[in-house]
Every structure is written in structure tokens, then in C-alpha cells.
């Protein structure tokens, strides 16, 4: 790898004259030199249309070369790209776009139709449609023969506003400078073995940090090739890998689950993949992927806000992220700031002392590296307290010093005075051969506290056998007595974020009031599930009124 650079703009200039393929689709290829020149033209377009105020460019596109050209163009022009989440709709989408003060929106005809009727505070001439012939002419008119560096761009120049996934709460726009992304490019190169010869398959959305930080930025740093499908497809994954000769890819847990749900073929290992990086995959899916496809998977930990808190260790036990990167990465009680005790694990990896061991992951020295949220001082104050960076994630460290992710802070479920991690329950449910994806969350109990509810995605909900499912749960030795779901929603298609994470806040809002069948644990002792009727749901909700807890039905 070449000399480390401090800005994305400088990294792009390093690729001028580079004739290695930089971007590939099934229809067309571009060398890195061509990528930089395409980027420079779009940067010139953005500069020509710039107005007073924040230089923010919204991009509402699938994974197309235009998205990458606008990333490069923004870097060269000193603008910030706002990746607009295409799964948002209506008032929520309108509010997000207005919140980040976009001067321009780059989209296509389909994306413009999605924005129709929304008051975004922009006139029609502020929308650039990449499939409009006039756009092609505009870009051609701004072609740059000899791209020149802007001396005003430095490591502190804002480059990305990344919306958080919003799985358990409202999305926030994370600030990411050119310098931060450049540092991540080199750090991830060292951590995950990126080299110039890599062919990187970018199947996760480009509006999300997973694809940008773990794939695109390292590819730019090394001059590796980025291959683009428009969006993730489980059935199209292996054909694409073979077509491009891909060596690396990124994933999230649900995407990997979809891959593992495809029928196994005898030639699955006939592919070029070497490794992949992702988060929140079940141990079973990871093991199956390696067996079927022969590539190594790096299961990591990170977020749009911060990264680098874990050091990989090849001796880490199943489920562990690795070791804390330094002495400042600790697990603490969020109320007292006292470091939690080491977790004692049984033979199944279950934490025997969860109340004493599970707490919030913090970085005592991370406050200076956190670049904040755009126009959200309250959220910043929640992240930076007492001079520490608080991740908002639960974790624990075992007696051997390995660190584990235990879910988001909002995933902590308290049942009968005992704490339960939703993530741990999800991992158990994913072992069921028919469960493709799952979300576990708290629902209120009509008398006191919470109960555990699970939503499971299966290929055919009519084929769901509650007795068989109950028997499966009864055979899971690491499922605590308080952790077994009292309610199970069975769906063909769970709601997800644009980055393919199960949207648990939507599930939690709906609870048992949904069109999918919902099963309730009846009796005591061994799990037994009964499908709820509308009248039974009404009776359950009347219990909340009887015990004066009706307010919890509207939370």
C-alpha cells in the first residue's frame, strides 16, 4: 500500500493514471483513472450549483456507479454526501432530508417519484436525475482535463452524514470527516487484510457505513476493484461472485441468514471468495457459510459513530468479538460508572452472572474521536458523558479477557427482576432450521414489568408448528427460564431497515396487533404456544386496564 493520506480527496488523486479496474458492473467497467475523472466532473457540477449554507448533497440511488462517482466528486469539491435511505417513506423521509440541509438531491426517475409530494424545501432545479439525458450533458460539460486539488480541503472537512439504522429508535445523522474515513481505510486494511489485488463485492447499501468504511474506503486506499450489484440478492450472490471473481464482501447478519436459506449446491465452494466482514451474524450461520463457501468471515464490532474498540484474536471462543483494543475499552454500569465483573460462562457459553457482568461498552479515551451528530446536541450529550464515549451497546468480558457484544442498550429486557439480552435470545432462535431472521424485544406485562416477545421470519408461516417450536426451545440448554418468548409473531417478511437489519421498534409498536399470526405461551413450565384470536388479544389488553397499566399500551 502507498503512503497513508489524510483525506479522501488526496487518496483519489493517487488513483489518477491508475489503469487497474476501479469499478465494475455487469454492464460496464471503469479504470481507477476513469473513476477519478468521472468524480471530478461531478464535483465540478456540485461546485457550479453551490449556494450559501452547508455544502450537503443528498444521494438517493441504489448501488450504482453514479453513487460512487458522487462520493468521489463530493470529496474533491469539499462537499458532504448524505446517503438517503430508500426504505424511508412519507413524513419520515421528508423530515430526514430537511433535517440535513441538502442543497442538491441526486437521484433517478424512480427515486424522484418516491419524493413526489414531499416538501423538501428545494426547487425542481435542485434535483439531478442521473437517467435524464440533460444530466448526461451537464456532466459532460463539466469534464475536467486535469483535476486540481482544492487547498481548502483537509482532514477536518465534513465528508459524510450517515443516518443511523434506527432499529430501536429515531435515526440520527452521524458526522464523518474525510480524515476519519481515511484513517478507517488504513486501519481496516491492516485489520482485514485488504490488498490491491482484491476484487470487492459491494452488496450492502452505499448509504450505510458498512459498505463505505469496511469496503469502499479500503478499496480506494489500495486501488482494489469495487463490483456493484444494484442491491443485495441471496440468489444472485454466488453468480455475481463468480462473474466478477470477487475475493471480499461485507454483510450484516440478516443478509447472511438469507444466503444460508438458499438451497445448498454441490459446487458452492467453486468460487473465488477469500474473506468477508460483517456484524451480528449468528454463530451457526457463520459456521455454515465457511463450510459451504470456503471463505473466512471476520465478525466485527463497530458503528457509524465510532470503531476500533476491538482487537481480533484467532483464539477467541465462538461468539466473542476479540479482545478490548486497549485498557480504555471497558464494560461499566451506566448509572454508577463502576466497571462490571468478569462474566462466568457455562459450557454452552451462557452468562451465569448477567446482572453483575453485562453493562454498557465505553471508551474512556474515545470522546475526542467522536465527531458528533448533525444538529443534535442532546444525542451528542448522551454519547459523551463524564469525558467518556458511551457506545449505547451492551457487552461483557469473560474471565479470559475476551469481549462480547450483548445487544443494543434498548434491547435489555427486564423480566421478574432479572435482565435478559434480546440478542442472546435471537441467537438461540436462529438455530431453528426454519427461522430465517428474528427480532426479540420487550412488550409490557399487564401486571408488572415486561415480557419477552419474538418475531420470526419463515418461508411459509402456514407451515409453522407451535408444538415443534416449543419442543425446540425446551431443548436449548442455554435458554434461561425468563428468556423464552411469551409471544411469538410468525411472518413471511419482517420489516427491515435499508441496511437489512430487523426494524424492532416497528415490531415493538405493533406488538400482537398485526396481521401476522401471533402465538402466546400458555400454562406454566414447559413451553406451549397457542395462536391468539382477536378476542383473546382484546381480553389481554383489558387486563392492562384492570391493573391500571393501560398507558403502557400506548408507549
From Swiss-Prot:
Q: Which GO terms describe its molecular function?
A: ATP binding; long-chain fatty acid transmembrane transporter activity; long-chain fatty acid-CoA ligase activity
Keyword presence, Cytoplasm: no
Q: Which SUPFAM superfamilies match?
A: Acetyl-CoA synthetase-like (SSF56801)
What pathway is this protein said to act in by its record? Answer: Steroid metabolism
Disulfide pairs here are none
Q: What induces it?
A: Up-regulated on cholate.
Classification via Pfam families: AMP-binding, AMP-binding_C
Q: What class of enzyme is it?
A: ligase
EC number(s): the record gives 6.2.1.-
* Any one biological process term the GO annotation gives: steroid metabolic process
This protein's superkingdom?
Answer: Bacteria
The UniProt keyword set, sorted, is: ATP-binding, Ligase, Lipid metabolism, Nucleotide-binding, Steroid metabolism
As its record notes, the protein acts as a catalyst of: 3-oxochol-4-en-22-oate + ATP + CoA = 3-oxochol-4-en-22-oyl-CoA + AMP + diphosphate; 3-hydroxy-9-oxo-9,10-seco-chola-1,3,5-trien-22-oate + ATP + CoA = 3-hydroxy-9-oxo-9,10-seco-chola-1,3,5-trien-22-oyl-CoA + AMP + diphosphate
* Record GO cellular component, one term: plasma membrane
UniProt lists the family membership as follows: Belongs to the ATP-dependent AMP-binding enzyme family.
According to its UniProt entry, the function of this protein is described as: Involved in cholate catabolism. Catalyzes the ATP-dependent formation of CoA thioesters of steroids with isopropanoyl side chains, likely occurring as degradation intermediates. Can use 4-BNC, HSBNC and HIDP as substrate.
Name of the featured protein:
Steroid-22-oyl-CoA synthetase
Amino acid at each position: 500500500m502507498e503512503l497513508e493520506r489524510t483525506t479522501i480527496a488526496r487518496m483519489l488523486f493517487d488513483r489518477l493514471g491508475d489503469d487497474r479496474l476501479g469499478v465494475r458492473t455487469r454492464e460496464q467497467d471503469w479504470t481507477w483513472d476513469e473513476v477519478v475523472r468521472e468524480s471530478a466532473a461531478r464535483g465540478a457540477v456540485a461546485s457550479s450549483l453551490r449556494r450559501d449554507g452547508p455544502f450537503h448533497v443528498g444521494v438517493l440511488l441504489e448501488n450504482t456507479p453514479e453513487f460512487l462517482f458522487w462520493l468521489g466528486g463530493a470529496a474533491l469539491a469539499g462537499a458532504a454526501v448524505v446517503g438517503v435511505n430508500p426504505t424511508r417513506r412519507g413524513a419520515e423521509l421528508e423530515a430526514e432530508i430537511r433535517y440535513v440541509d441538502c442543497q442538491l438531491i441526486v437521484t433517478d426517475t424512480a427515486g424522484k417519484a418516491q419524493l413526489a409530494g414531499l416538501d423538501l424545501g428545494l426547487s425542481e432545479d435542485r434535483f439531478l436525475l442521473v437517467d435524464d439525458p440533460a444530466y448526461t450533458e451537464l456532466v459532460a460539460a463539466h469534464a475536467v482535463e486535469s483535476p486540481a486539488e482544492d487547498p481548502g480541503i483537509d482532514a477536518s472537512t465534513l465528508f459524510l452524514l450517515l443516518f443511523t439504522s434506527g432499529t430501536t429508535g429515531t435515526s440520527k445523522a452521524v458526522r464523518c470527516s474525510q480524515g476519519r474515513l481515511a484513517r478507517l481505510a488504513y486501519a481496516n486494511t491492516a485489520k482485514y487484510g485488504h490488498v490491491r489485488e482484491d476484487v470487492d463485492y459491494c452488496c450492502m447499501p452505499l448509504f450505510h457505513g458498512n459498505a463505505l468504511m469496511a469496503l469502499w474506503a479500503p478499496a480506494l486506499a489500495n486501488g482494489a476493484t469495487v463490483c456493484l450489484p444494484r442491491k443485495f440478492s441471496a440468489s444472485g450472490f454466488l453468480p455475481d461472485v463468480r462473474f466478477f471473481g470477487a475475493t471480499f464482501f461485507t454483510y450484516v447478519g440478516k443478509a447472511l441468514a438469507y444466503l444460508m436459506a438458499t438451497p445448498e449446491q454441490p459446487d458452492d465452494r467453486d468460487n473465488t471468495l477469500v474473506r468477508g466482514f460483517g456484524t451480528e451474524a449468528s454463530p451457526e450461520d457463520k459456521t455454515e457459510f465457511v463450510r459451504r463457501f470456503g471463505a473466512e468471515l471476520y465478525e466485527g464490532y463497530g458503528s457509524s459513530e465510532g470503531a476500533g474498540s476491538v482487537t481480533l484474536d484467532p483464539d477467541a471462543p465462538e461468539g466473542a468479538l476479540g479482545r478490548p483494543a486497549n485498557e480504555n475499552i471497558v464494560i461499566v454500569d451506566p448509572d454508577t460508572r463502576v466497571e462490571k465483573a468478569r462474566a462466568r460462562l457455562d459450557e454452552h457459553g451462557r452468562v451465569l452472572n448477567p446482572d453483575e457482568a453485562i453493562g454498557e461498552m465505553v471508551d474512556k479515551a474515545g470522546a475526542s474521536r467522536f465527531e458528533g451528530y448533525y444538529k443534535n446536541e442532546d444525542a451528542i450529550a448522551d454519547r459523551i458523558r463524564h469525558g467518556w464515549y458511551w457506545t449505547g451497546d451492551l457487552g461483557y468480558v469473560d474471565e479470559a479477557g475476551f469481549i462480547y457484544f450483548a445487544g443494543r442498550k434498548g434491547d435489555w429486557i427486564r423480566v421478574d427482576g432479572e435482565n435478559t439480552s434480546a440478542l442472546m435470545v435471537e441467537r438461540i432462535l436462529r438455530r431453528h432450521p426454519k427461522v430465517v431472521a428474528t427480532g426479540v424485544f420487550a412488550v409490557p406485562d399487564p401486571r408488572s414489568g415486561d415480557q419477552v416477545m419474538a418475531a420470526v421470519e419463515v418461508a411459509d408461516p402456514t407451515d409453522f408448528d407451535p408444538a415443534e417450536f416449543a419442543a425446540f426451545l425446551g431443548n436449548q440448554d442455554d435458554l434461561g427460564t425468563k428468556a423464552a418468548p411469551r409471544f411469538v409473531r410468525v411472518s413471511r417478511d419482517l420489516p427491515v431497515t435499508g441496511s437489512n437489519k430487523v426494524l424492532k421498534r416497528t415490531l415493538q409498536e405493533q406488538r400482537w396487533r398485526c396481521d401476522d399470526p401471533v402465538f402466546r405461551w400458555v400454562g406454566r413450565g414447559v413451553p406451549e404456544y397457542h395462536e391468539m384470536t382477536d378476542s383473546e388479544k382484546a381480553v389481554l389488553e383489558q387486563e392492562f386496564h384492570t391493573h391500571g397499566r393501560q398507558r403502557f399500551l400506548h408507549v
